[in-house]
Amino acid sequence: DNQYGHAYGNAIIPDTYTIDLTGFCMPTPSTKITSPFGPRWRRMHNGLDLKVNIGDTIVAAFDGKVRIVKYERRGYGKYVVIRHDNGLETIYGHLSKQLVEENQLVKAGEVIGLGGNTGRSTGSHLHFETRFLGIAINPIYMFDFPKQDIVADTYTFRKTKGVRSAGSHDTQVA
């Protein structure tokens, strides 16, 4: 977690919101998840880690606008945050090199950086995070990494408890 990844402040979180996932592009050809989303050690791991080699090409998951290009020595290392028209933001962490600038428009599949091992990292990988209004959502609820595809054309964000189904997941909001 960092101050730059939460730009929505006091935004009102809707009870439900349908996110269009069409137009998605896998951020890397890698299908190997080396660390899943969820509690880890004494903190929450708000994304998942995909195995990449240093220098591997990392691409934008959707069309969007680059919001942040920064370096955090004890966090994401060199990272990029992209805001997308579908309501999501994606975060790409531990890059060896960032190849975009803040406010730059990017297309899905466009190269945004190179795989790396910067910041708080134990080996070369891509930390990939998906957020809606600053709330981290497990990427596997939207994307099937082994198949390199989306789970469904849409994902329904729900902030209240209920029944889970393909393409939706209940997210607890503090």
Question: What is the meaning of each model-derived region?
Answer:
Residues 53, 69, 86-109:
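Short histidine-centered loop motifs in beta-beta connectors
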Residues 101, 110, 129-174:
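Acidic, glycine-rich catalytic/binding loops that coordinate metals and/or anionic ligands
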Residues 47, 94, 125-129:
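Histidine-centered divalent metal-coordination motifs
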Residues 36, 69-70, 98, 115-118:
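Residue-level recognition of beta-strand microenvironments
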Residues 74-81, 124-126:
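Short aromatic-glycine-enriched beta-strand elements
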Residues 37-38, 78-91:
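Short, basic/aromatic beta-hairpin or loop at an interaction surface
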Residues 1-77, 108, 158, 164-174:
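Surface-exposed, glycine-biased beta-strand/turn segments
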Residues 50, 79-82, 107-119:
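Short hydrophobic beta/alpha edge segments that flank linear recognition/processing sites
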